[in-house]
Amino acid sequence: QRTLKVSSSGPRSFSSRSFSSGPSSRISSSSYSRVGSNSSFRSGVGFGPNYGMGLGSSIGVGGITAVSVNQSLLNPLKLELDPSIQAVRTQEKEQIKTLNNKFASFIDKVRFLEQQNKILETKWSFLQQQKTSQSNLDGLFEKYITNLRRQLDSMGQEKLKLEVELGNMQGLVEDFKKKYEDEINKRTEMENEFVLIKKDVDEAYMNKVELESRLEGLTDEINFLRHLYEEEIKEMQSQISDTSVVVSMDNSRSLDLDGIIADVRAQYEEIANRSRAEAETMYQIKYEELQLLAGKHGDDLRHTKTEISE
């Protein structure tokens, strides 16, 4: 045991003390005070929730009394806790932390929503104050809508005009398309006709070449006949001269051979002249025919060339 002595001279006071041992044991002592002639002393000892024990004493007015304290009561108690209880408490602490975090987030959300609510209230009040401006905006929008409707009507009328013009243009396109097709058909026909004309021109050219060759042949033949006739005339004249010589030699017989010679000469000259005239006439006729044929083919050739150039 330990004896604690307390003096009563003058006002005194001291605070309580506490001792703890383990998670659930606690020892506490009360305070002592004295004021004036009265004095008091209180003392107490407490433990955790599972074990409890108290010690108390009081001193009234008067002298100093010795107080005895059981020293064994001041020793810490060896208390052991159940591990399951510790786990439950840890889990409860974690749950409390989680709930505290959720509660804090809820509080933040509530504050944010309150701020948004205040902002919306401010906007609403501002919009309520701006009614006159909204009415002006309504008129402005109505004018704008009216203008748009007017533009829409004008666009509709212009659309009708454009549709009419489109129909006209489509008709013109169809007409030009038909004309184009007709021109293509005409071009095809002209190309075919050109091919035929070219064949005719080629044939005419070949005929012209043939006729020119024939003309040259006939010219050569006429020249040959003319030369032949001239030679025959010369031969006949030489024969006539020989006959006249013979007749003159026989003049001793006193025959009238001069008349006979004159008649024979006249007959030969007539035959020669007639043959010459017939040959010249035949040559002239053939020459004129060839000239006409050549002129005709020349005209056809010029006409064909003109059509080809066109």
Swiss-Prot record:
There is a cross-link at K198 (Glycyl lysine isopeptide (Lys-Gly) (interchain with G-Cter in SUMO1)). Pfam families: Filament (PF00038), Keratin_2_head (PF16208). The modification N6-malonyllysine is found at K102. There is a cross-link at K5, K123, K131, K198, K286, K296, K305 (Glycyl lysine isopeptide (Lys-Gly) (interchain with G-Cter in SUMO2)). The modification Phosphoserine is found at S7, S9, S15, S16, S18, S21, S25, S28, S31, S33, S37, S254, S275. It comes from the Eukaryota. InterPro entries: IF_rod_dom, Keratin_2_head, Keratin_II. The modification N6-acetyllysine is found at K208, K296. Residues 261-310 are annotated as: Coil 2. Residues 145-236 are annotated as: Coil 1B. It is found in: Cytoplasm; Nucleus, Nucleoplasm; Nucleus matrix. The modification Asymmetric dimethylarginine is found at R42. The keyword Iron does not apply. PROSITE patterns: IF_ROD_2. O-glycosylated. O-GlcNAcylation at multiple sites increases solubility, and decreases stability by inducing proteasomal degradation. The modification Omega-N-methylarginine is found at R17, R26, R34, R42. Together with KRT19, helps to link the contractile apparatus to dystrophin at the costameres of striated muscle. PANTHER family: GATA-TYPE DOMAIN-CONTAINING PROTEIN, KERATIN, TYPE II CYTOSKELETAL 8. Belongs to the intermediate filament family. This is Keratin, type II cytoskeletal 8. It comes from Potorous tridactylus (Potoroo).
